[in-house]
Amino acid sequence: VRGFHIFGFQSFILTKKEVEDFYEIYKGIPNQDYHGLVRQGSSGRCLVLALSQGSGLKLTEEIPSVVEAFRKLCGPSDPEVCRVLYPDSLRAKYGGMNQEENAVHCSDLEEDGILEVEYFFTLLQPYQSV
């Protein structure tokens, strides 16, 4: 993706427990189908990217971080909303019919991004041979 530097890329087939651990923070949050997220996340192969700012990514007051820039590229979590309001977003192009099948997970906060990279590339990667 233009403007981002990919410093980590790995294919995973996650167990239900690994997905439950990853999405633990969403458990009990209104408008989040935790069980749907777990079901979708453990349904097959997923590709995990770790991104940083590349030379083509210009941060501004409106988009102050790599996380915000990637969230904008992904679009809102509902692919149907994306198709109407953000037709060029990743979720509009590749998402399914609901929030669980929205094609892309992206961190909510800069701090979450760091923890999520550590989860996949430090905790899980040594145990994955996919």
Annotate the PLM regions:
Residues V1-V130:
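Non-catalytic terminal and connector segments of soluble metabolic enzymes
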